UniProtKB/Swiss-Prot annotation:
The gene is fslG. It comes from Dictyostelium discoideum (Social amoeba). CDD domains: CRD_FZ. Keywords: Disulfide bond, Glycoprotein, Membrane, Receptor, Signal, Transmembrane, Transmembrane helix. Residues 268-273, 346-358, 423-445, 524-574 are cytoplasmic. This is Frizzled and smoothened-like protein G. Disulfide bonds join C35-C109, C48-C102, C91-C138, C127-C178. The chain crosses the membrane at residues 247-267, 274-294, 325-345, 359-379, 402-422, 446-466, 503-523. Residues 550-574 are annotated as: Disordered. InterPro entries: GPCR_2-like_7TM (IPR017981), GPCR_2_secretin-like (IPR000832), GPCR_Fz/Smo-like (IPR050949).
Amino acid sequence: MKSIIFITFFIFFLKKLNGLPNGYGVGLVDPNGQCMNYIGDSIDQPLCKNKLSNNGEFIYSTIGNSLNSQTLSQQTIAKSFEALTFIQNQCQDLLFAEYGICNIYLSPCIITTVAPLKNISLPQRLCNSACQRMVTNCPRLGEKIDCSISFLFPEVGTLYNLSDYGYKANGGLYEVPCFNPTADYDNSSSLNEFIEICPSPLLLKNSSDPKYSKRGYTYLPPTNCVLPCPVPNYTKEKWNQIENLSKVLSTISFVCSIYNILSFGILKKKKTKYTICISALSASVALINLGDIIKIGVGYEKVLCPEPGRFATQVDDPLCGLTAALFHVGICSTVLWTTTMAIYLYSAIKNIKLFKFRYFIIFNTGFSLTSLIIAASASKFEAGTGSIECWIRDRWYSICLFWLPCGICLLIGTICIASVIVEIYKVSKNIKLSESETIMRQIKPIISVILVSGSFTYLFIIFFDIERNFGGYRSAVTDYVLCLLNSTDNGIECHTSGPSYNPYFMFYFFMRFFGILFFLIYGTSKNARDSWYELFIKIKVSLSETSSTISNNSGGGSSQQKQQQQNEIKLEKI
């Protein structure tokens, strides 16, 4: 049916083209067209109220399949406003552009009587001068709006062939003058303001309002649109995988860390430098995991994304600050105690006497707490745009307070471990490693330091790779916005550019595997088993002593009873 109408219109257009007056376009008559009142803007999304001629009393509409064409027009207008929102810094006279767009898709309507009891509703097209004003002040609109199409944007008016409906004057051509919204714009522009619309899932938040500015929203200039939280670097399913990984590993790792703390820090009577290092490392990892356990209890999204589109900050969200503090102290201490263990391994192999161990304790604790105080006092803890934890998100603060100093520590630890390996290689040339008690005692610490140092080296590589490509990730947001503007499924298939998923997944895996790693290396050792064995022996002895005391007391009481009974018998005999 549509093809027949188009062919008829095209033949008519060719017939009339030579005799068509200048400044006129040719319009197509739709028998289903009606002049109707504007259905109105939705409650939550203003569009064209106060921007239509006659206050929207006569809008050209068609009714088909129980759907008012105005509804479809509103959807098209909303998409146009979305595009206009993101090119607003390239345009002037933005409000007039929105007036024009409203009157293009919600055209004024004229009713004409062509025969007794026969009325025809015809659209009044936007004048070419108004169209030219729109694209001149906003050239990017010219990519979507072609003002040279005369039947959409006539200079004077539109001619409709109503001869089939009984109209005979002017050869059956009925003239409808074009509509210029300039007068309406001049009279009512003070009642309106430029309407920004953000394509889903972006949200609109006024950046000039203190309620929203600098509270964890990530704005997309030049708009007031903010990225969703969490940022859509990956699909929802992949984010769930990372979250589930964190939940499972953090819980297991926390339990393993507590076990090591009890085994080497509390139950162990005779504490050595290595048992202190193991306890300190396990406590550090437990702090990291404790932050995750808090998020599991409260809910990851409630902690990291307390409001739609807003990432948590320590100023407005105390739980974010708490989990960030636990994570920061934990991860700093893990690096420092790993380095401490590497230094002591090297000193043990080389028989070098170091300064007193308490200085390591003071430095490691002091640095972790000092860097925490600096970051917290500057309010630098917040949830990241692509992270499942709160931490330092300011680039220079994170580099100065963690990556640089801890990188130096890891370098020192790596040098120490490399030296230890070289020393072991030298020893292995002369004797079997199994015959060297000193080296055999250091095997497990060496393995743990190598694995932890290797894991942190991987984290460093990932971090600086993200930093190196950060500019590319930011510039790729343009492609993400274009995808949203052209999307028909609310942007479900659109994703921002970020780190590759697999390396990012492993990034979180390593940070939450340390507790399990230390348990496998130390928690299953004879030293750990002996600590618990001694505890069980103490409990058993204590229970035995208690039972014996109760038994003795019970025995003594029965003897007295027997003696009393015997005395009573003697009295009876007397």
